[in-house]
């Protein structure tokens, strides 16, 4: 080699061969379309390997040196850079391996490296031992590939139905191999390779490990030899070998010997069959088109030389090592010659064809038939290959049909021999030695050949020439070897042979003839013909019946003989007292007769086993009465062997239920097993005695086994409950007791002459137990003692046998102990991997033991429940606990471990592994047991390793590896595939249930997690890394990975959908569980790239298994959701991004690197045709997944019943429903079947019996309906599950993944596409309503995100605009682009307005589709609609105080902005739906589910707010819904009252109330709405509600706001405020809106205030000050300022008498006084003024609290000032008669600077009016506040315009006030968003405060001016002598008069007498000081800064001027 020596890490002697075998399998067996091309490539590449079959690379000096130095210099490894140093040990091993197999040194190194890599697959083996396995596995793969390729050739015997291209390719390839001498190589290898020699070599070099390793190596070597031999066999079947090759084969067979048991081994059998097929010309009889081609290929017919050579070779007199083998070949040759001679144009071959007789004679002389029987047919491998059977069948039938003279000769010879024997016997001589027994051997061969029929071929049918035409299906299948319809002539000859041989049958061949018939009767139709033959044989001799003459082979003869024996033996029967009778010789029957009887009994059994008609016909025959005679004979003294056969025949009869029922009674009557003890009888009788005395002594137990077999058959056919009634307690118990105590419990201690019989006994008795327990269903009556009368006394009847077995298995009984001990012995035996006698029976016995435990586990819960309810004094213990018990032999609790060890034998004994897995799955549900099991499983390192290997091996088992094509495999293979599959399912279910238990649990151990440390610290690795074993997790990933490297996707998803579904579920559970999530996801991400490689292939498509497919996708999507969430949290952006691209991209990706086009190519071209603009787009994967969920669901046809009542059937079905493992409610079909059948069985009378078949048919209809219904439920559940998972994935993508990974525009497009698709699917008429809730949920999330995305985009656009036109720019800029028609994306959002409208329409359609029901679904949809409508809402804009600069004209003429346009279109679309939509929403708002009502109200709120036409308001009023809502307030009252208790019930009512009030408030904002509400009496309703009077006492500690953060449930005070504030807001809004009806509104509100006056007073007293109480005050003062005014009383349309008028006036007066009192608290220098500065170190959420409090306090001041102004204006039309609310004292400003202590009391006594000083103080305070607010506002605006430039600390601080926790975890972009949000809030708060300050200033100035004007100009000072008295009386009366203007002619001046001149002078002087220059300048500055644009122009200036003027006037 010129290339440098490099090592192939996959081992060139193994990896490539494994690959060839895989490719061959894909092409030939799995029929994968793309595999043909790959196979062609690989065959061309590896042709030399096939030509130099099994040839190893030779040793080589250069390589030797290279390896020698590898520890220092290293070796290069293919596909890896650099070199790798090899350890010395490995180099040593490589040289040993090189010598051992005579292979090149590098090849040895490769094997060892591959061994090291594969080591995890072979736990417990070293790399050297694994290398040995790999070496032979490579050989096996190449041999198997060769065999498969040859099997796929075109040829004469079979076809695999492959494509012509593939068949031609393999035929051509194998032809080339044959030309290179394949036959010679194969025969040489078969001779050279010898297991024993190989083992000796390996043994010498310590190349053999454990028993399992030895077994595996020996199996591999045997398989190599066998596959090579079978390659030749397959070749010969398809196209015969040439002359040289045939001679080589003959030469090989000459030297062959037989095995120890006399049969040929598998290899030589295959080679013999190959040679026989070379001589096979049976295909000529076919009429296929290809026949002529084949004839030309057949050297037998075309080459004279071939015939001559072979003929002379076979005529050669030299003996072979096996003369019988030589004879077989000669016979085949003779028959071939005879066949050729019958063809036309063969005269040239006459010299050979005439020698056929002589050749056949030679064969017969060498006992050909005996050899075929003893060495060929008996071989265990013979029945494993269908074409062996067919070839021997052809051989025999050809002989019988083509050589009739020979057959006649054989018969004549037999007759002659029989005569000689007869004469010898008569003369008393020994029979002559020279006798030939050829005919006898031929018959026995025929009997043996057809005795088994594994492929259901029923080839023996050819021997029966039917008198009537047979209605057979085509039995021969698609094979070409045998004609579908034999020529009748052949059949005639064969059937003649069968009949004639029975005529005048000589006694010597009587038994062989019967055995032949027994073989020929094997099969349903054959049995029928044989029965007829025996019937006909007897009938022709009816006349001489008395002599028992007639044909000895007839029913007549046989049953007559039986009767005679019975008569004869019955007379001989000694009395019961004669104890010794059993030991007398049985005089009745000679050995010869016994053999004959046994042969006939076996024939009878065969016939009646197959043919039910024969069974019934024989049984019902009046003269023969076989059952009676057999039972009679069983009571006689005959040998046990004969008794056994009689019992077996009875068992065959017992297959029919009608016969079985009577058989039970007969058995009981004849006491075959003694069940009744007669007191006078000293000696026990029956089978028990036979077992104990005769069989035990002989150490053979045929009778016991036969008896068990009989019982086994009978319990299956019919089970009598009252067996033995009248003579003993009725029931099966005596039989069960005998089987349990005498047979089962003692089977181990008995002696056995034949070792295998021990296990046969165990198997057959355990089978009975299994059947009894399988058919037992615990019933309530089993647990009640049933009394029966027996001979005049009451006795307890026996329990059902199932009950008894359950009781024994749920206790530490000998039976359970023996069963467990048997399991232990079984697993020990299997661990030896050695054959032993009775192995098959031991395996069966173990299987029954495991099945018994399984059944017990399944039934124990019901059994124990019923036992608990009953009065029975029985104690049982759950089996899972018993299994935890101590094993008496090992003194350990290892029972479960023993059961689990069977999984280790899953490959060799799949049934045992299946039962074991089922038991483990059953007991794993209990978490306490889990912990113990983990301990038991991990206690011993070697056992732990084995158990893990067992589980992994069962999961790994690849049936596809065996290439069993299910449609062509045998029944057994299909069954095993199903069992292996079920085992894997059970193991996965075990993992799933275990994962739900707390750690430590079995699943964690099996999946490779830490058990001794915390689970989350596990570091999962690939197998072999850091000593990590191969675990179930690796096996599961392996199952799912297969196929992900190609374009088809995971193979398991298609081929074993249920398995794949559970695998995905396990992985999801691991990812979802907090302990296992971290390690699992890390491992899947780093080592496997699992999710990406799996998600590529979504959606899966598998219509046939839709349920599994949907669940697979569900678990995978859920796992993907977790992965996206986790990677997003951990900031693993690249991982997140990769998955997002995969799911969301609409650009095609090419995942295939090797030039195979991606799947999307076709899509691209298709879409290219359809949409020219999106030519390169493909459908997003997330949408494809949605497409794959079919929303429509077929519903089964309703039941049509004739007999049963439909309603009752529905009821029964409902009663049979239960929750399955997945939590779906399905009907238990088995239980339903039992109930219905019991119902039918209960019917009495003839009519019922006649109609039974019809009733059963109807039951079948019901069951089919229920199965359909279950499937429907499961399918809907799966669809819902898939849709939920899809929704979860979509939600995670939108919420959890970093926003910047999806561009804003793409984000909107994605949401739009998903929304449109999901709507289209659910709005389809076929869509299942059950899916609506999930879809609605998804729509809600999607709309929320769409709304967010669009609004974010709007904000971002706005941020880019210049600072001045901040928001105006954004609103106007949209109109600079061209109109929408030209540019589709212009408009509101990236997705364009039209898309938004479509979404809105679909949402509304969806709402209407839900109709009356589905309110919860609509709840989601209302939420979605609200989010959608939010898009058209203007975002919070910062009030920069700039916008107002525009003139009114500019504002009126501004173009419509995007928000208004969208809003207008939205409302137009909503209104186009008319009353239908209104009706649905209004109905939901009024009744139904609370959340539904809240959302419906919110939606109404939103729509009414934008509905300019007021259509909805009109509908609400006219349809009465508004009135209903208003009236419901009174109903809410009581519920709300209950919410004020300290521990409230649910707060739902509160939230519903808040929603309702919010909606009513929204309605009240519209003038028309306010009028409607007044008309509906909303305020009257509020006045009636008592809840407002239930104001809770506040906690004094909560002064100045709550120090403790509030809990989730608000305190009673907060709850009360949540109830009161909406009512106050509603009143305020109504007062504001109802301008036309203002007085009416004010009157009603006043009544509301008065009816709750206590509460109102309490609020006005304002005992504690908190944000909440200030809010209340702010609202209340606002209402009072508009409602409690003079003149309102006169408008009240109530008939008030004097007294009530006084009362009302009193209330109003009190309100006034308290309001004015507030001024001194909030406007004065009181410490409340300092309230806002109390808490300097404010934290996040307290910041906004502080803002709220500040705002509320300013609002209160503003409201009180407004009230003062209103009182003044309304009460005093002229200045001269002004109402003075303030005394002319300015002392307030002076004397109130110090803090006061009595803040709890009202500050101003009610008799004292506040002085004007408070106004001045407020004015100054407000002016100062204004400037601080103004600065703060300006700073915030500039910060907002430059957020990105702010220092990080400031940004953080801003964020914290919005989001107190977790600021550090969010991205910078998100921090900016939060900071902006906070700044906008601050700006708007400051803007409001500025507005309030400005208002307060203006009002203060106005009031000051009015008072000063009055005092300084119009007031007449009085003398002050009685000022105190005057002030007390006059002020009081004046205030009342003022308030109500009740007496208009009141002389105001009289009230002013109390103001002295001194007061006035002091006032003027103080005022001049207080209202100084600085204050005036401030006020004018304020106007300049603010009031110009905001309010009355130069109002402040005018007032200041006037006040200044007033103060200048000198008073004289």
UniProtKB/Swiss-Prot annotation:
Q: What protein is this chain from?
A: Nuclear pore complex protein Nup205
The tissues where this chain's protein is expressed are given as: Expressed in the testis.
One annotated GO biological process: nuclear pore complex assembly
Task: Using the UniProt entry, name the condition the protein is associated with.
Answer: Nephrotic syndrome 13: A form of nephrotic syndrome, a renal disease clinically characterized by severe proteinuria, resulting in complications such as hypoalbuminemia, hyperlipidemia and edema. Kidney biopsies show non-specific histologic changes such as focal segmental glomerulosclerosis and diffuse mesangial proliferation. Some affected individuals have an inherited steroid-resistant form and progress to end-stage renal failure.
Q: Which UniProt keywords apply?
A: Acetylation, Disease variant, Membrane, mRNA transport, Nuclear pore complex, Nucleus, Phosphoprotein, Protein transport, Translocation, Transport
Q: Cellular component terms, GO, for this chain's entry? A: cytosol; membrane; nuclear envelope; nuclear membrane; nuclear periphery; nuclear pore; nuclear pore inner ring
Gene behind the chain:
NUP205
As for what it does, the entry says: Plays a role in the nuclear pore complex (NPC) assembly and/or maintenance. May anchor NUP62 and other nucleoporins, but not NUP153 and TPR, to the NPC. In association with TMEM209, may be involved in nuclear transport of various nuclear proteins in addition to MYC.
Where does this chain mainly localize?
nucleus
Q: Molecular function (GO) terms listed?
A: structural constituent of nuclear pore
Membrane topology of the entry: Peripheral membrane protein
- Location in or out of the cell: Nucleus membrane; Nucleus, Nuclear pore complex
User: Which residues in this protein are found as Phosphothreonine?
Assistant: 3
Assigned protein family: Belongs to the NUP186/NUP192/NUP205 family.
- Positions of modified residues (N-acetylalanine): 2
Modified positions (Phosphoserine) in chain numbering: 575, 1165, 1167, 1939, 1942
Q: How does it assemble?
A: Part of the nuclear pore complex (NPC). Forms a complex with NUP35, NUP93, NUP155 and lamin B. Does not interact with TPR. Interacts with TMEM209 and MYC.
